[in-house]
């Protein structure tokens, strides 16, 4: 046998033995398939449909099991009861952010999504309060979304009812809402800076969704030595941060401490208030990372949901017709939809919820981590262990949602046609790490979808039975297949 191969195998075995001793000494991990040296269970997992693999392993090992993505163990939680117990009942213990080496390399542990400890708690509290205050300000977030919805309608009218790919236009609207909240102004859809920002965000989202990213995250030691699209992600992120820094400097020059205009102003004021605190988490570097996180989390996820939602409405014409009937009855054709309308529109509300449930946008959540040694069911999860929660197993639970693979707003309606809440509805996750922008995203989805369907009929040149709604292969988020449609003014 080749001496080099012998050396590699020997070192791999020693590494696994060391990890096993370390984990067995500190805790009792759940059962799982036997990992291979270095690569762990990667060959046993369908990286194009990880949720399917999780479902398979849950039938063998139960709702809590261990997989090795590379040499590091990850505890997987499957099913509503186990997910709720982990994220709600043990929310503090599992409030750490799991490892994501590519992102960690870009933001150095800063920002809102991938930070930990005191840093994360302070940034999360600040962001929640800031967004809440904007919702109650002179110009509320709802006003900004309504303005963007009107601009979106005008852009769609410019298509003149011709066949078009809606990807770009539907990406612009949520991104512009974020721009309004963060930068104080929206952009024209043809603005050069806006187009460049959109291009970088869209490209990064696609790359981060690729199976290659799963390999990079499982084997981070090899990142620096491998060519590949991960290098493009790092470059794009640097350019996004550079643009954000330019906007921050503009804000610094015009800042009025008594009249904050947007998220950046509020952050700069907080920095000034804490300038004598040597341990402050509010720095320029932290601001850039946080704003970048707000863009990534608040634009791509919402635009993908919109795009997927229109595809489902294009296929299920009977649902679209019922929504339009309810809109015509409650709002009419000429008044702008507002959030107060939602309580009088149970079918439309159910439709928006069903889109989110059905598409299951982030099927396996963003990884969590144990902040201490955690006793979870019959196991002891060592501090620092990554935890992955299967949101698919909750959103597609066949007991809560009969025929979960079928798109049916009836999943959220009672026998009298009233809207019916469900504890299983957790597309924004649950617990301490629940999405900060949930309220904003819910508002955007209701107002933008309702405004589009109020103003346009959706038409496809493909027979509805032939419209494919199967998501494209990905690892992190579910993306709809490419499609074209016509927006016919009503």
UniProtKB/Swiss-Prot annotation:
Heme binds at residue 435. SUPFAM superfamilies: Cytochrome P450. Its main location: endoplasmic reticulum. Its cofactor is heme. The keyword Transcription does not apply. PROSITE patterns: CYTOCHROME_P450. Keywords: Endoplasmic reticulum, Heme, Iron, Membrane, Metal-binding, Microsome, Monooxygenase, Oxidoreductase. It holds the Pfam family p450. It is found in: Endoplasmic reticulum membrane; Microsome membrane. Its EC number is 1.14.14.1. One of its GO terms (molecular function) is iron ion binding. CDD domains: CYP2C-like (cd20665). One of its GO terms (cellular component) is endoplasmic reticulum membrane. Induction: P450 can be induced to high levels in liver and other tissues by various foreign compounds, including drugs, pesticides, and carcinogens. It catalyses: an organic molecule + reduced [NADPH--hemoprotein reductase] + O2 = an alcohol + oxidized [NADPH--hemoprotein reductase] + H2O + H(+). It is a peripheral membrane protein. Metabolizes arachidonic acid mainly to 19-hydroxyeicosatetraenoic acid (HETE). Belongs to the cytochrome P450 family. PANTHER family: CYTOCHROME P450 2C18 (PTHR24300:SF423), CYTOCHROME P450 508A4-RELATED (PTHR24300). This is Cytochrome P450 2C55. The lineage of its organism: Eukaryota, Metazoa, Chordata, Craniata, Vertebrata. The gene is Cyp2c55.
């Amino acid at each position: 046998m080749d001496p080099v191969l012998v050396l590699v195998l020997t070192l791999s075995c020693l590494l696994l033995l060391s990890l096993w001793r370390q984990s067995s000494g500190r805790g009792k991990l759940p059962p799982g398939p036997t990992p291979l040296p270095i690569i762990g269970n990667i060959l046993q997992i369908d990286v194009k449909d990880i949720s399917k693999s999780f479902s398979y392993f849950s039938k063998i090992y139960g709702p809590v099991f261990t997989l090795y993505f590379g040499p590091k163990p990850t505890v997987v939680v499957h099913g509503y009861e186990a997910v709720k117990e982990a994220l709600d009942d043990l929310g503090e213990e599992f409030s750490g952010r799991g490892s994501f080496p590519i992102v960690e390399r870009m933001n150095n542990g800063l920002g809102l999504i991938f930070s930990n400890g005191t840093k994360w708690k302070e940034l999360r509290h600040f962001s929640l309060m800031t967004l809440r205050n904007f919702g109650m300000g002179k110009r509320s977030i709802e006003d900004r979304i309504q303005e963007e919805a009107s601009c979106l309608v005008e852009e769609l009218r410019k298509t003149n009812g011709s066949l078009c790919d809606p990807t770009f236009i539907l990406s612009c609207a949520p991104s512009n809402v974020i721009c309004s909240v963060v930068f104080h102004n929206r952009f024209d859809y043809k603005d050069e800076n806006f187009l460049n920002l959109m291009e970088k965000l869209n490209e990064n989202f696609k790359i981060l969704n690729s199976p290659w990213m799963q390999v990079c995250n499982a084997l981070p030691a090899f990142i620096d030595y491998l060519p590949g699209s991960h290098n493009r992600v790092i470059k794009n992120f640097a350019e996004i941060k550079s643009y954000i820094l330019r906007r921050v400097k503009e804000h610094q020059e015009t800042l009025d401490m008594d009249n904050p205009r947007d998220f950046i102003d509020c952050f700069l004021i907080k920095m000034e208030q804490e300038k004598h605190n040597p341990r402050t988490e509010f720095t320029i570097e932290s601001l850039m990372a946080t704003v970048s996180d707000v863009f990534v989390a608040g634009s791509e996820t919402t635009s993908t949901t919109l795009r997927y939602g229109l595809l489902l409405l294009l296929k299920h014409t009977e649902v679209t017709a019922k929504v339009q009937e309810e809109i015509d009855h409650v709002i009419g054709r000429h008044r702008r939809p507002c959030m107060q309308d939602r309580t009088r529109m149970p079918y439309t509300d159910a439709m928006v919820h069903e889109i989110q449930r059905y598409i299951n946008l982030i099927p396996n959540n963003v990884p969590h981590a144990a902040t201490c040694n955690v006793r979870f069911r019959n196991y002891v999860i060592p501090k620092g262990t990554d935890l992955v929660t299967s949101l698919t197993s909750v959103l597609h639970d066949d007991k809560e949602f009969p025929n979960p693979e079928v798109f049916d707003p009836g999943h959220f309606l009672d026998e009298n046609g009233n809207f019916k809440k469900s504890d299983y509805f957790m597309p924004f996750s649950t617990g301490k790490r629940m999405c900060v922008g949930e309220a904003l995203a819910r508002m955007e989805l209701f107002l933008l979808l309702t405004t589009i369907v109020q103003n346009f009929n959706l038409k496809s040149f493909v027979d509805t039975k032939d419209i494919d709604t199967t998501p494209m292969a990905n690892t992190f988020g579910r993306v709809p297949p490419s499609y074209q449609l016509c927006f016919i003014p009503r």
